[in-house]
Structures are given as structure tokens and as C-alpha cells.
Swiss-Prot record:
Function, in words: May be involved in plant defense signaling.
Main location: membrane
Subcellular location(s) per record: Cell membrane
Organism of provenance: Arabidopsis thaliana (Mouse-ear cress)
Membrane topology: Lipid-anchor
Enzyme's top EC category: transferase
Gene3D superfamilies, per database record: Phosphorylase Kinase, domain 1 (3.30.200.20), Transferase(Phosphotransferase) domain 1 (1.10.510.10)
Protein induction: Induced by infection with the bacterial pathogen Pseudomonas syringae pv maculicola strain ES4326.
Record GO biological process: innate immune response
Protein name per Swiss-Prot or TrEMBL: Probable serine/threonine-protein kinase PBL19
Compositionally biased intervals (Polar residues): 30-53
Length: 410
């Protein structure tokens, strides 16, 4: 990655004119392709600072009217230079509707400032759903502001001779995703406390979305990105949508997302609720407990589906320790792990009305972390023959899985 360089303009005045031209052109293209994005914001700013602090809005609709879309408009040429003409050597993520590159841009468009490392998502021109998701991310991430939601710096929208070009520019997340650390092919193991802290941050991000009456719809370990301090940030908002209004209990929508994480009521009926996200959160809680993916086809039949498998090892049973990630080498608090499994079980209730709100989940996680800090561990090692067999199967090499979406990770 040391080959990255930045193209600096020798004519600052000309560059400023070009930037202003790109800004006007980008806004015009958005007005033509998605007028709902620009009607809610009269200006797109080059300022990369977080939006000004405002009273807590009632919903995301209030944000659309109260805040400007604080986004920078890039030219295609600028982003092409930032990535060495979209070099394959700089690819950090790839999925069905686009590719993510690592690049460097001028900070605030000023060549005198140090370059800014970013993640650039380039939409696949053949992607049927990609353009709609691109618009959704520009619309949503242009106005939200939370430490546990990835920051969108800007976008590019050009219709040129080479065809339609749609790109998004995000802050760069140097520690990739929770998935990359939880299911590694190397020896590194994510410590127990760090797993809890990451899930707490992710829960606070979801709570923020739910306060805005936004349903994330795609919570999974690969969408929880980690910065250089391992602070978690939710990413990929192409599937997010506004929740129900008034007396409505749900919104009905096409069933999309990732198999294994979606709530049963959504899969069966297409009815989407805020607590559909809570279910997905429960799935990831079991992923951090077990160190297993929600679906692993290389396991014995009885163990291929994570949620079916863990039912055989209830949190209150003596056999529970058999499902805890063996890579932790017993360096986790026994009571804390059981409490976390019980919280996951609440999140996974079939009846969504019985699931806790994300606000309650946050409080429970804080309590579990506090109790875990006061508990002595490593816990006693299980030495039964059955436990050894389970653990040997757990450390088997995971199957290679392709990404369904594109994450902003490096």
C-alpha cells in the first residue's frame, strides 16, 4: 500500500474552480436521478467536520429538514487518481454490486493539508439494486451523526461517455470488520472483553437508528467495522429504511438481506419492524460467544445452523461451556458468558413483542461488562470426552464464503 500517492494541483485557484464545478454538476445529477435527496438540503458542503449539534429529532424525516447534507462532491477523475485508476492492488472489499478501494484524497480539497486515507466504493454498472442502495446511503449518511455509524465523506455521480458512474467515499476503517477478527484464518483471537465492547458500541449505534425510527435491516458481523482504536461503526446502509409511522406496527417490503440473520417474521411475511434488528443482533451475540458463523456447511448436519446447534447447550446447563469459542482458551468469565447467552436468547424470541428494545440491550450489555470485570477467570476447563469432540469440530477450517455486500474496510 506504500505505492499510494496524491496528485497535487499546481494551480490552487484552478482546482478550487474545478471543485465548485464538480459540486454544481454533482448536485444537478442528484436532482435528476434522485430529487428527494437534494430537496431536503439546499447545499452540499466541503466541510468534513461533523454536523452541528441539534436537539434530538423525532425521526429521520426531521433530520432531512433540519440538517444539511454535509457531503463533498468528487469528480470521477479525482477518485480515479486517488486509486491509481482503480488498481486491483488497492481493492479492500468486493461484492455483488460493487468494489471498495483504499485511496488518498486531498483533505477538504486543500493541497496544503495532509492527504486523507479513505475507502471508495465504486458501483457495479451491471448491478440492478446497486443504484437504489447508492441513493439510500447518500440520503441517510448525509445527515446522520453518531460515533458508532460510519462517516460518509462524499460521493461522485457522473453520466459520461463511459457510462453511469456512482461512487461513495467513506472514512477508512483500518481494522476491517468484526467478522474478520471473529472468524480468522490466522492465530489471532479477539479477546472476550473486546468482543463485548464492540457489541456494546454496535448496540448504541442501533439504538441511535431506532430513535430516528430507522430500521437497519442488515445487521451482521461483516457490517460492524472497526477503526484504529477498535471502535465499532455500522456500515452499508443501502438496505436501511424508515420504520412504521403512527399506529402502524410494521412496514411491508421486499425480503432482502443476508440469510441466517433475518428475523422469522420478516422472512415469512415481509413485515419489517424495529425489533427485526434486535433479532439480528441476537444472532451476532451467539457468533461472538461461539466463534462460529451463523451457517457453516462444512460442519456435521446437526451443527451447520448456529441457532439450532446452540439450543442443545442452554445457558443454564452444565454443557453450556462446550459451545464457547475454544480459541479463547477459557479466558472468559463463566457467569458473564451465560448472561450474554441469555440476552441473546431474549433477542431471538420468535414473537418480536417479547424481544427487548435496543436501549434495554445496551443497559444489559453494560451490566454484563461490569460483572465480567469483577469476575475471576480463566474459568475451569471442561475435560469431558464430548467437550473435546465439540471443540475439535469448532476449530476446523471455516469454509470460504463470498461477500453478499460491499463493506468499507481495509
Amino acid at each position: 500500500m506504500n505505492c499510494l500517492f496524491l496528485f497535487k494541483s499546481k494551480k490552487p485557484r484552478k482546482q478550487q474552480k474545478d471543485n465548485n464545478k464538480n459540486k454544481r454538476k454533482g448536485k444537478e445529477l442528484l436532482q435528476n436521478s434522485a430529487p428527494e435527496l437534494t430537496n431536503r438540503s439546499e447545499t452540499s458542503s466541503f466541510n468534513l467536520q461533523t454536523p452541528r449539534s441539534l436537539p434530538s429529532p423525532r425521526s429521520i424525516k426531521d433530520l432531512y429538514t433540519e440538517r444539511e447534507q454535509n457531503l463533498r462532491v468528487f469528480s470521477y477523475e479525482e477518485l480515479s487518481k486517488a486509486t491509481y485508476v482503480f488498481s486491483r492492488k488497492l481493492v479492500i472489499g468486493e461484492g455483488g454490486f460493487g468494489i471498495v478501494y483504499k485511496g488518498k484524497i486531498l483533505s477538504n480539497g486543500d493541497s496544503s493539508d495532509p492527504p486523507l486515507v479513505v475507502a471508495i466504493k465504486k458501483l457495479n454498472r451491471q448491478g440492478l439494486q446497486g443504484h437504489k442502495q447508492w441513493l439510500a446511503e447518500v440520503q441517510f449518511l448525509g445527515v446522520v451523526n453518531h460515533p458508532n455509524v460510519v462517516k460518509l465523506i462524499g460521493y461522485c455521480s457522473e453520466d459520461g461517455e463511459t457510462g453511469i458512474e456512482r461512487l461513495l467515499v467513506y472514512e477508512y476503517m483500518s481494522n476491517r470488520s468484526l467478522e474478520d477478527h471473529l472468524f480468522p484464518r490466522r492465530s489471532h483471537t479477539l479477546p472476550w472483553k473486546k468482543r463485548l465492547e464492540i457489541m456494546l458500541g454496535a448496540a448504541e449505534g442501533l439504538t441511535y437508528l431506532h430513535d430516528l425510527k430507522v430500521i437497519y435491516r442488515d445487521f451482521k458481523s461483516s457490517n460492524v467495522l472497526l477503526d484504529d482504536q477498535f471502535c465499532p461503526k455500522l456500515s452499508d446502509f443501502g438496505l436501511a429504511r424508515e420504520g412504521p409511522d403512527g399506529d402502524n406496527t410494521h412496514v411491508t417490503t421486499a425480503r432482502v438481506g443476508t440469510h441466517g440473520y433475518a428475523a422469522p417474521e420478516y422472512v415469512q411475511t415481509g413485515h419489517l419492524r424495529l425489533k427485526s434488528d434486535v433479532y439480528s443482533f441476537g444472532v451476532v451475540l451467539y457468533e461472538i460467544i461461539t466463534g462460529r458463523r451463523t451457517i457453516e456447511r462444512n460442519k456435521p448436519v446437526a451443527e451447520r445452523r448456529l441457532l439450532d446447534w446452540v439450543k442443545e447447550y442452554p445457558a443454564d446447563s452444565q454443557r453450556f461451556s462446550m459451545i464457547v469459542d475454544p480459541r479463547l482458551r477459557n479466558n472468559y468469565p463463566a457467569a458473564g458468558a451465560r448472561s450474554l447467552a441469555k440476552l441473546a436468547d431474549l433477542c431471538l424470541k420468535k414473537n418480536d413483542k417479547e424481544r427487548p428494545t435496543m436501549e434495554i440491550v445496551v443497559e444489559r450489555l453494560k451490566k454484563i461488562i461490569e460483572e465480567s470485570d469483577s469476575e475471576d477467570y480463566p474459568m475451569a476447563t471442561t475435560t469431558t470426552k464430548e467437550s473435546s469432540q465439540v471443540r475439535r469440530r469448532q476449530v476446523a477450517k471455516p469454509e470460504k464464503q463470498s461477500l453478499r455486500g460491499v463493506s468499507v474496510r481495509g
